[in-house]
């Protein structure tokens, strides 16, 4: 498996933490922009459907081939839009559920080492004698112990075996630690 060096500055790391915290806060807000988006797109879909009914009615009453063809094309476009909106909303709701559930699931538990994720990002940090290791959307980010952020190894984790292989390859023995990576 090929590892890629990724420039990862302290500013970038803190920005990621701030964005993550801001997104979690937004998910807890009942008037979140995502929910507004769902409401607006649903209303828009209803309006489009009403317009379709009007065009179709005019075509039938006037027996106009042009109106019937236009309503057919318009109907196809509405169906495509509805399918895309439905898929998008399902994804949004799933992400919101994952982000706000507060439940954690174990990714790896072996030899006293436990890696856990909450939604798509971890709130747990892992300690090794030289590195902070954080899993962020199934990428391992290695950060220097003294809080001076250096280039990190970024490895997409698609399977559990990839994660085990990464830890074994780099001789990383981790002790499970709760809390933030800063100020330890």
Task: Describe each PLM feature range.
Residues 34-100:
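Alpha-helical transmembrane spans
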Residues 139-184:
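A membrane-cytosol interface segment of integral membrane proteins
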């Amino acid at each position: 498996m090929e590892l890629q060096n990724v420039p990862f500055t302290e500013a970038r790391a803190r920005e990621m933490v701030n964005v993550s915290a801001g997104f979690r806060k937004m998910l807890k807000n009942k008037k979140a922009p995502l929910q507004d988006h769902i409401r607006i797109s649903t209303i828009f879909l209803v309006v489009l459907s009403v317009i379709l009914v009007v065009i179709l009615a005019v075509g039938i009453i006037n027996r106009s081939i042009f109106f019937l063809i236009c309503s057919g094309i318009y109907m196809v476009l509405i169906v495509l839009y509805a399918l895309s909106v439905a898929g998008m909303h399902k994804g949004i709701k799933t992400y919101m559920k994952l982000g706000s559930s507060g439940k954690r699931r174990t990714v790896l538990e072996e030899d006293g080492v436990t890696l856990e994720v909450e939604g798509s990002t971890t709130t747990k940090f892992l300690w090794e004698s030289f590195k902070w290791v954080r899993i962020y959307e199934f990428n391992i980010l290695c950060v220097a112990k003294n809080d001076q952020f250096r280039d990190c190894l970024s490895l997409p984790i698609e399977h559990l075996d990839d994660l085990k292989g990464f830890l074994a390859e780099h001789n990383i023995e981790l002790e499970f630690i709760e809390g933030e990576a800063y100020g330890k």
